[in-house]
């Protein structure tokens, strides 16, 4: 089997088959540098299909490559091939020069087709083998491919005519030219044609082989029609027509006829054979031709000398000859084109067939030879390497098994030695014990026989010495015997170890001998064999070291170890020396026998190694079977394992050596290390001791703190119990004191009888509420009340020292049974009539209020006038000032502080009601206020009727800014309008006003309690600081019970509530509208619930997902100012979503990106009265049409000398025209009754008039458009040709209105689409047409551009005609004229109305019609309304209110929402006004006046904080709260701007609430605050509501967010 046909997995490779064109695409070419085909490496076998021809798609412009398998190359101007892969172009000469000799004979057949192959004489069999070739059309080798010859383009260029070479190679022409023999042409035409080339057309839809401007298209060297017909190239037919035409396409040509046809001359101007030679010479000089140039048939061809005539003109009277000549011209040109195409296609097919055959033979043979050479070398090296690796692996496995057996035997021998040593030790101990016993017995015998005679002793001793051995001798012999036994066992063990080591050596030798190849030849030196040798050397060295260690050799033992032998061992050796000498013979014999056995085993091992391996073939057979399984996977893996093991062994050995060295040097550092260890241990012990004592102290401290905490808790509970009892008694004291105060004030007791001295009265702080008795506390309360009355009277006397007071002894009792503040406590004290200087009539309840205020002033007591909004608090306050001026001659100074929006109202009402009081409006800039202060800020100023001022009106902001100036004046009366502005006792405003010097203070507020009871205490302390001194205690007393009642509907103590009312009654007067004003109807409040729109839901859910519960709880616990601000910000974001999503982000105006250019601006002032501004917008993209395509009748075909438009004009519109006058006359004369033109006599028209009408281009155009709408299709084709295939698809996606132009509305019949129908049904059709023109597009394009400009380079005629067609004044009137102009022409000009009018648009409009669809996308206001649920409801509500003549006040919390509402009102065309915090004071006055006096104003937009205080807007009868305020009192004041005195209509209040959002919780919270007011002011019961925190702090808002 051929190894080159085997793959690595053992499967057979498929035989080579020449690939087709599709498989060859994208392959690499031959790489001659490495002498390896197709750019592959030596071990890479992925080259079974080596292909080097690459198909290039850039040879054809704007179209895919042709489907042929091989394509022709491109050639540049210098004749070299132009290709993207020139870097990898095959050098066949170099390739052939490097082919080995053994393949020269096989390769010589291919070298005939390689250029310069004869230049290699050094290669045998390769030189002089090029077969003879036949010349073809180009006199080149017929069987070769031009791409294989580097010099072929130059040679071909030299042999082609200059005019033809321009079309073929686009190179610089050369003057020399050779003719082509007919034999070469016939032989070339007889070559076979590839099947794929014959079946596939060479020319596709988008590529013209004869287009001069398609430079990338391949051209043939035959004559092209573009060359024959190009007048600018000055092609001379007599030079190249008959000489260079291929015989296949060269019929017999009449020189005169060809001259006539090619130059386009009429027959009347043909030259005769007898023409003069001078005329011919003149023509040759004119056209720069050689004088001796002749054709093959020796016929002289001369060009025409007369001017060229248009083919449409009639140049001769002989119409028949003219027609024949033109037909011959047309037919011959068609015949010439067909012949040329056939020759070109045949030549192309022949070249492609030659290229395919050459490629197949070269590639197939080269691959086969290379495969054989590569496969033999690869298999030789690869197989030997695999076998060697397997041998090494088997040897390694066997060595590992041998080493494992050795280790096992070694362990067994060590165990035997240990057992023998133990037995020997036991025997020695026993011998010593027996020897000691015998010695004792001998000693006893000596002592017993001491008294015997010496003779007997001597005899006995001599006998004993002769017959029995001595006991010492016996002892020595036993020791020697045991020692010899142990030595024998050691010798046996060492002999076994020697045998094992010899076996290892024999195994290594056998493994080494196994590395020899089976055929006896040594393997070549490869990296694999070198690695195996080094590995073997290391393994043998390791085995020798192991055997030496096992045998116990002492040669490798260091000398130092010998010196360290202990003295005990030396003594033992000396003791057993005698035993060793006696048993040396036995041990020597044993050693000799052991050596003999070892030598015998070595001999056997050597014999085994040297003997021939009988199982060698069997092993090799097994190896061949295993090789295919483990060659790819096992060998690399095992090799990696071996490498890793070797690395691990070396690493372990290195670490072991390092550890040994460290241990050897340890004794040198023993002292230092011990010291360090001692210090470390001491530190650790000290640290642990400290930790223990700290832990102990911490536990003791915790226990102590726990005990202290428990004690504090017990004490705190006891203190709370005592404090609760103390507070209860203190509250009772305060109530009693206030009741007595009210009683004293009402009865007007005498000072001498009832009021004690101040020295006998104790202060509240000095009273001990824990130990004092009830009687003592009551007595102290009486004294405190009397003292308070005395202080109040003394304070008023400071201002009345110089005035005479008229005492009034009338008194009244308290009305303790009433639970309201409608009847003042000081009633019946004295009656006050309405002042005469007051220029209005007070109502009954207003007169009662004046009496109450006058009595408070007389007693020096401050009060709170808390009438409901709209009951005339301002008039009552002004009447008090008039009363003081008229009755007591107190003309001031009076100070009125009011919100900024009501300052003008105060000034106007004071001037109108009391003209005698001079009022100074104190507001404006810093400079203005400085000037105003000169009038009232004076020292020692007296106030009477002639004083420069009496009343100063200013705002809260200015009072705080200029507090130093106001504090320098002693004010008789200070009136605070909308006193809820000082509800916070911690504000700087409250503190500044409290420091003013004034006799009396009057607070005007419609809501004395807005949120909590703490605000009520702030007002009470402001008017009576001596009674209501403790803020915390007041809040603790009243907030706990009343607010909990409003929160959870608990039961109130009625008695305590009555006493609380008694506290407030002396200082507060409050009336409601329903009780005192019967003519003012009640207001109707409605809640309008709105749903979130889809856009609002998305934003609301997004905000909810961003909230972190953990952060909210943490912020609720902290409760700082920053925390409250951040939580408030979150709540406001939710409220923005409920109002309108555009509060986050407005929708911008969008328009597509304009990809166009414009001309520079025109100076209009220089153009005079008439300015012509043409359409000058241009696209960045321009499309070039080849001149030949334009002139040959392409997309924009126009009549010309060399186009077919002249034939169409002549034959189709003139000769073959049924409207010809001659044909019409003949038809009428031949058949007057049955002629199709018999109707002419009825319309009184002549055939000539009919022919002129037909020749009108407009009539032709309308006829075609009416019949088949071909014009519209042509326009679409042009658009698709310029923009691409997706243009029509994009237009289908758009919802575009139909253009309303003249074409659509004008017609000739009285149908629904005729102009007369539309003119008579204008009212019916106007609405529908308006909807169509205003229709928006569904799809918004990202970019827009004008149509792509088309131009033809080199043709001025195209540019002129194109601009004339688009800019012509007559045609532009019909193409782009608007509808209005056409209607005017129809109505005013009857002549124009008779003309035929086009029914459909001729061209798309360049601009945008008036009122039609625009690309500029302005946000839709309808969508703006639909995006908000509230705005949608408001839109419907305003329509109803407008229809019923209502006027509306709309309140907002956010000024940005007011901005959006202004856009909505402008869109709906509602007249409105706007007032917010940014409005100036003067503007507010003017807007209020304008609203009250202009009934056409429909809506008043106000902010709740700025426009809800103090102004009178009774002209409105409807109030709408777009979003509710946190404070219900603010909303109540805002709705009372319309529901007040002077309102004649029913007031309706609408409150918009978004369902299921945070707004619902805000409204519930506001209702609970209203319940607090209801309890405190009117004493009514409340309905049960959801339990919530009334403090209004961060925890309340956190609870709302958690519910979200």
UniProtKB/Swiss-Prot annotation:
Annotated protein name in UniProt: Chromatin-remodeling ATPase INO80
GO biological process terms, semicolon-separated: CENP-A containing chromatin assembly; chromatin remodeling; DNA repair; transcription initiation-coupled chromatin remodeling
Quaternary context: Component of the INO80 chromatin-remodeling complex.
Record remark: domains: The DBINO region is involved in binding to DNA.
Compartments where found: Nucleus
This protein's record includes keyword ATP-binding: yes
The reaction(s) this protein catalyses: ATP + H2O = ADP + phosphate + H(+)
PROSITE patterns referenced in this protein's UniProt entry, alphabetically: DBINO, HELICASE_ATP_BIND_1, HELICASE_CTER
GO CC, any one term: Ino80 complex
Domain Helicase C-terminal intervals: 1433-1591
Extent of Polar residues compositional bias: 28-38, 271-281, 457-470, 507-526, 543-553, 568-577, 585-597, 802-820
Motif (DEAQ box): 977-980
Modification sites for Phosphothreonine: 179
Enzyme Commission code: 3.6.4.-
Binding site for ATP: 867-874
Region entry Disordered, spans: 1-38, 174-201, 266-285, 297-316, 406-620, 792-820
Compositionally skewed regions (Basic and acidic residues) per UniProt: 1-16, 406-429, 474-490, 497-506
Biased composition (Basic residues): 557-566
Domain Helicase ATP-binding residue range list: 854-1026
The species this protein was found in: Schizosaccharomyces pombe (strain 972 / ATCC 24843)
Gene3D superfamilies: P-loop containing nucleotide triphosphate hydrolases (3.40.50.300), Tandem AAA-ATPase domain (3.40.50.10810)
Gene Ontology MF, one: ATP hydrolysis activity
